[in-house]
Design a protein with these regions (language model features):
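C-terminal boundary and immediately downstream tail of ABC-type ATPase nucleotide-binding domains
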Residues: 171-188
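Conserved catalytic motifs of ABC-family nucleotide-binding domains
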Residues: 100
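Conserved ABC ATPase "signature" region
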Residues: 56-74, 183-184
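ABC ATPase NBD coupling module
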Residues: 5-22, 36, 40, 48, ...
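Conserved ABC ATPase signature
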Residues: 79-83, 87
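A short, surface-exposed alpha-helical micro-motif characterized by mixed small hydrophobic
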Residues: 146-148
Length: 188
């Protein structure tokens, strides 16, 4: 598609709504500045969107969000290289939710993780979705991830939507041949 429209709670997207939509990238290590500590990485958006917060309030908020994603707040002075892939993904999620967005856009959120971490991250995202009423936009080739987290699915081919609907309906009875092939090859 050459154009489209994005609405958040009925409001057309504009730069002032950027806080309401945060990203979690496929490769969190590549998205982190290796010279920044966990405190600096996770609080970066707070410094932009809530500049009135003092250092103590910012540190407390970072500690709170780290605990929400299953990390201890005693890691604030550590650097990204000191963490496993799953821990880095938790840090990326913490960085995204610290400003309390309404929407998280997740690009292949588990593709770089081993199976154990994949399950933990999926469970964490489902919990955060329930606790905070988050809407998740998941970009993934892994149909198991889509089935685990999504309510609705859009299947794209060459940048065009070829099928959309409720996840269970599309997975149970796909209309497009391309979707049928995807599901067949994925074994779902």
């Amino acid at each position: 598609p050459a154009k489209g429209r994005l609405n958040i709670n009925g409001q057309a997207w504009r730069p002032e709504l950027r806080r309401e939509m945060q990203m979690v990238f496929q490769d969190p290590f590549g998205a982190f500045n290796p010279r920044m500590t966990v405190l600096e990485i996770v609080s970066e958006a707070l410094r932009v969107y809530e500049p009135q917060l003092n250092q103590a309030a910012m540190r407390a908020r970072v500690g709170e969000v780290l605990r929400q994603v299953g990390l201890d707040d005693d890691i604030l002075s550590r650097y990204p290289h000191a963490f496993s892939g799953g821990q880095r993904q938790r840090l990326a999620i913490a960085r995204a939710i610290i400003v309390r967005p309404q929407v998280l856009v997740l690009d292949e959120p588990t593709s770089a993780l081993d199976v154990q971490w994949q399950q933990q991250i999926l469970a964490l995202l489902a919990d955060l979705q329930r606790q905070h009423g988050l809407s998740l936009i998941i970009i993934s080739h892994d149909l198991a991830v889509i089935r685990a987290l999504a309510h609705r699915v859009m299947v794209l081919k060459d940048g065009c939507v070829i099928e959309a609907g409720e996840v269970e309906a599309v997975f149970a009875k796909p209309n497009a041949d391309y979707t049928k092939k995807l599901l067949m090859h994925a074994g779902t």
